[in-house]
Design a protein with these regions (language model features):
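Tryptophan-centered short beta-strand motifs
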Residues: 24, 30, 70-80, 130-133
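Short beta-strand/loop motifs in extracellular/secreted proteins, especially
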Residues: 40, 56-60, 118-120, 132, ...
Length: 209
């Protein structure tokens, strides 16, 4: 029986880690998909930066272009918005001087409001790209245990919030030349800064043997 093997491009940057202030439109990198095969997935992460509820949900657009250059042919492929933005988040600081890559737990100044299943955002402002999203498994007083080990170590004292959001958006690249992500906190002002990062995984080729 023949087996088809797909060759993929992993983690192409749609939007580098960006602090998206209220009342702004943030436009990510235009990714050339002219030679890609059909299926692709956009992976989008949003982290809260304050405990306050947002004034409005954050809006997202995946856009496609029929041209190899220029800005006059971008059209929406798919639009969505955050789910928990208008709910107040739990926010505290990391109180763990030995929070290292590979750790499966860390200590907070206050564990109040952090519960099992929470999507947690550890916000690095010195080197924003070192920020990290993780999922809580349990909380005991001020110690949070997470489902998977941390990828990076984290700076003691950084802000930590819950109610982060993760999205995986399937898209067919076969009818597009370029794809990009737009984060819109202007059409309906979010009132607060949110941090967003996004990647695209595409299929480059398929071989059957």
């Amino acid at each position: 029986m023949a087996t088809t093997t797909l060759t993929k491009s992993a983690a192409t940057v749609l939007l580098a880690h960006t602090q998206c202030a209220t009342a702004t439109v943030t436009i990510g990198s235009a990714v050339d998909v002219s030679t890609k095969l059909g299926p692709a997935t956009a992976f989008v992460k949003m982290g809260r930066t304050v405990s306050n509820a947002l004034g409005n949900q954050v809006r997202f657009r995946l856009e496609g272009s029929a041209k190899t250059s220029g800005n006059d042919e971008w059209v929406p492929i798919y639009e969505w918005q955050s789910l928990n933005g208008t709910t107040a988040a739990s926010k505290t600081t990391l109180n763990d001087a030995a929070c290292d890559a590979g750790d499966t737990s860390f200590t907070l100044t206050s564990g109040t409001g952090f519960t099992a299943g929470d999507l947690i955002y550890l916000r690095e402002t010195g080197t924003p790209a070192n920020s990290e999203w993780c999922r809580g498994k349990s909380t005991s007083t001020n110690t949070v245990t997470i489902e998977e080990a941390l990828t990076r170590g984290h700076t003691n004292g950084i802000d930590v919030t819950d109610l982060a959001e993760l999205f995986a958006i399937p898209v067919d690249t076969s009818g597009h030349v370029r794809i990009r992500l737009v984060v819109d906190t202007a059409s309906a002002a979010s009132g607060q800064t949110v941090d967003v990062i996004a990647w695209l995984v595409t299929v480059d080729s398929a071989s059957t043997a």
